[in-house]
Amino acid sequence: MPAEFLQLNNLGFVMICTEDFLPNHNDCKNSGDHCDLCVQKIIENGITDVVFDLHLLVDWDARRTLESHYPDYIGEVLFSYEPEWGFEFHEALREAGWSIECALESFGEHHGPAVTWLYRLYFENFSHGFLGERERFADVARDLIAKGVRVWALGNASQEWVDCARTTCPILGEINGVSASYEYHLRKPNIMIYRDFLSKNGLSASSTVFVESDLRSLKTAQRIECASTKLFTL
């Protein structure tokens, strides 16, 4: 096994960042060779399971839910609200298992009726936020599957989000499994969600790669107990 795979963290798994995994978007978009090389390296290095962040496979944007009703500046009243008790705060709670009803009630306790109504409209038009799968990552996932590598998805999402994503993203029905934060009542980058995911699916940590969209999860793992975590380029 190559040296970079021996420099594993205390949990035994390797994380990579998408900027390293696919350093040039145009390379992947216009040439199959670049993505094939990534897949080939995964196979050569004995990786049996690749876990994509859910949001890499699903084309989602919350702002689309209000676009057909209001100009952007109206939507920003909701989406850019203050961090404490605002939109992002309550969406994080939903991703950790809160229901829509609980989120709306809590939001209404901290904001006026106009903004709360926008939040309610966001839920009513929730499915409009999805545009299908992200082609470049879905293509890589299919290449991995074709080569015999098991592919999974794990990310921060509510049950409603996952349900809608499944109806618009064929790749989610082709991979080995989809897990989301609401099931664990934990959100990335909490290290326990990775441990629980590996245990739940019976995966071997030393042969699993997590493909992340940013470095927050990696940095959190290092800060807690994973100082020897290796970030590398496939």
Identify the residue ranges that each predicted region occupies.
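Asp-based, Mg2+/Mn2+-dependent phosphohydrolase catalytic module
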Residues: P2-K29, H34-D53, A138, S158-Q159, ...
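Active-site neighborhood of HAD-like aspartate-dependent phosphohydrolases
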Residues: L11-T18, C38-G86
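Alpha-helical elements of Rossmann-like donor-binding domains used by nucleotide-donor carbohydrate transfer enzymes
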Residues: R64-H69, E88-F89, C102, S106, ...
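Hydrophobic alpha-helical core bundles mediating ligand binding, dimerization, or RNAP-core interactions
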Residues: L66-Y70, E82-W85, L104-G108, Y122-S127, ...
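A metal-dependent, Asp-based hydrolase signature
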Residues: E88-F123
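Short, acidic loop-to-helix structural element flanking the phosphoryl-transfer center
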Residues: R120-W152, I191
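Short, well-structured secondary-structure segments
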Residues: R150-G155, K230
